[in-house]
Amino acid sequence: MYKNLHPKYFRLAAEYDPSGDQPKAIGELSDRIESGETDIVLLGATGTGKSATIAWLIEKLARPTLIIAHNKTLAAQLANEFRKFFPDNAVEYFVSYYDYYQPEAYVPKTDTFIEKDASVNSEVERLRHRATTSLLTRRDVIVVATVSCIYGLGAPSEYLKAGFRLEVGQKISQRVLLERFTQLQYNRNDVGFERGNFRVRGDTIEIIPVYEEYTVRIEMWGDEIERVLCLHPVTGNLLSEQRGVLIFPASHYVTSSENLKRAIVDIRKELQQRLRYFKRNNSLLEAQRLETRTEYDIELMEQLGFCSGIENYSRHIDGRAPGEPPFCLLDYFDDDFLTVIDESHVTVPQIGSMHAGDFSRKKALVENGFRLPSAIDNRPLCFDEFRQRVGQVIYLSATPGKYELSKSDGVVEQIIRPTGLVDPKITVKPIKGQIDDLLEEIRKRKLLSERVLVTTLTKRMAEELTDFLSEAGVNVSYLHSDIDTLHRVELLTSLRMGRIDVLVGINLLREGLDLPEVSLVAILDADKEGFLRSTTSFIQTIGRAARHVSGEVHMYADNMTESMQKSIDETNRRRRIQQDYNRKMGVTPVPIKKTVSDITEVLSRPSRKIDCTILDSLPDPKIDGKQIKSHIKSLEAKMYMAAESLMFEEAAELRDEIQSLKEKFLKPRGSGGKIRQ
């Protein structure tokens, strides 16, 4: 009912036209989608502009689109990329909102119950709500998500039904309006005003919707809305004056009072059945445990309308039958939406594996009286359920997996790069003397201001090689799994800027990562078969050198394995196609020129330091409270901007700095507690 308020078409803002294999791929994908095909593989070599191809396709088809990536970092990169493609349309980001998550679990062997423990990232939570709000109010929506999109979410019909529009001139009493906000699970807080709260000041009501960054001020004249204003949440400055505003629930699990009453009746019935089961089996401890916990949750739902862990009762709240799949993000899309699975060789198996792990954990909780059996139905979709809901799917990968290849009636190939760059030349060298040979090759690249990636099989070998190269005078660093995202970004930035010439690691795939300065990828012990030396891993690793005009890959091996041969044959096939095209069209390969910030702009700005100049100049014992508060407001504004740009690590860094300042300078004397954010 709200979708006529927004445009229905996508408008692509590209600085260039389709080139290379892109026009052919766009045409073929469009034809196959419009003819009704449900599974299509886009086999795109590294650097051929697969994301741009999908952007042009979305503009042509004008359908809501879900893009699934296999981790948050890649999802953020894609969201940032598509926001640049579609600045006038809704490009949303939907991932898990937990910075830290320990699910509820029970270990029977040690009789250990682990309480749910989680740290929620409020900025990511806002973006999740904005994604569902956009899907319910407009057609021109692209949502970039992780597997979070297959996990249980409240019913979209209830979420939509609960939302309402406030307009200037509307007759509504302040009391009724406050009741509506409370029913939508917004909290009244006249002091600590933050997202998800509302406050009252005379005839003025202010609310920060969970999916917005601004404050909505509703000015009343008696029982009539006189003005609707949008304000900056920190400064209070006027951003705009509106004719009306949409208010959606503060929780995806909101439901009507009638539904909740019915659900509570059903929960009590199931509880009694389960208690009889435990008592028949003389499991009195389990019975008492379940009764105490469930009755407590029911009392909270009756009094407040919700409880902690209410999602475990979602089957009853939604009115679903036992075993019926839960609602999830997919149910918020229109029926004709398009799904794009990025790096499908990784993402498809990931989607398929979520259900089994969740079931195993929940089963132990149910059997030992910590949860009702219906809690098992608060789960991710199994793969068949996912496949039934997504309709038409495009699988995107340089190395498609067996599943997607078996489902697709032939692949759409995108081999030719718009830049004219060809796949790297591959050379196989003997293992004997590989380190000395590698050192010589590194020195050659150093003279040309080029960079090198080296992949090893073991952590120990990577560490020893890093030490050896460092002693030999090479600017080298070791990239390993213990390095956090920000430090990883700093190392990659240092590599691109030339502060580091070589990166050594075990798994340097990082699909989707652009390192145009890398001209050599060295694969040590290439003939040791395993998942790090599989055909897929080889092709992905080879792709790290495909963005340089002089890209080469050196495989150190004494034997030619099947995986090596397949990856070499496929790379050479692509290389021949690319070279033939360049000769025929008179194309000269052009080096990729990409600013260093482009690779990391979603995660962090290079050498980004929080501005603490004010703090450095303040004498600690006699701190100026007003100055500190002013500085905190400035940092909060920067944090909101960083989160809006999907730079969540930067936003988190700012958040931690704000928390530290509040604890150090603003905590009340005698208080041992933490300042609530």
UniProtKB/Swiss-Prot annotation:
Residue span of motif Beta-hairpin: 97-120
Top-level taxon of the source organism: Bacteria
Record remark: domains: The beta-hairpin motif is involved in DNA binding.
Organism: Tropheryma whipplei (strain TW08/27) (Whipple's bacillus)
GO cellular component: cytoplasm; excinuclease repair complex
Family matches, as InterPro entries: Helicase/UvrB_N (IPR006935), Helicase_ATP-bd (IPR014001), Helicase_C-like (IPR001650), P-loop_NTPase (IPR027417), UVR_dom (IPR001943), UVR_dom_sf (IPR036876), UvrB (IPR004807), UvrB_inter (IPR041471)
Protein family per UniProt: Belongs to the UvrB family.
GO biological process: nucleotide-excision repair; SOS response
HAMAP family named in the record: UvrB (MF_00204)
Pfam families: Helicase_C, ResIII, UVR, UvrB, UvrB_inter
Keywords, ordered alphabetically: ATP-binding, Cytoplasm, DNA damage, DNA excision, DNA repair, Excision nuclease, Nucleotide-binding, SOS response
Entry's localization field: Cytoplasm
Function in brief: The UvrABC repair system catalyzes the recognition and processing of DNA lesions. A damage recognition complex composed of 2 UvrA and 2 UvrB subunits scans DNA for abnormalities. Upon binding of the UvrA(2)B(2) complex to a putative damaged site, the DNA wraps around one UvrB monomer. DNA wrap is dependent on ATP binding by UvrB and probably causes local melting of the DNA helix, facilitating insertion of UvrB beta-hairpin between the DNA strands. Then UvrB probes one DNA strand for the presence of a lesion.
Residues of the Helicase C-terminal domain: 434-596
Chain ranges of the UVR domain: 629-664
NCBIfam families: PRK05298.1 (NF003673), uvrb (TIGR00631)
Domain Helicase ATP-binding: 31-417
GO molecular function terms attached to this record: ATP binding; ATP hydrolysis activity; DNA binding; excinuclease ABC activity
Residues binding ATP: 44-51
Self-association and partners: Forms a heterotetramer with UvrA during the search for lesions. Interacts with UvrC in an incision complex.
Protein name: UvrABC system protein B
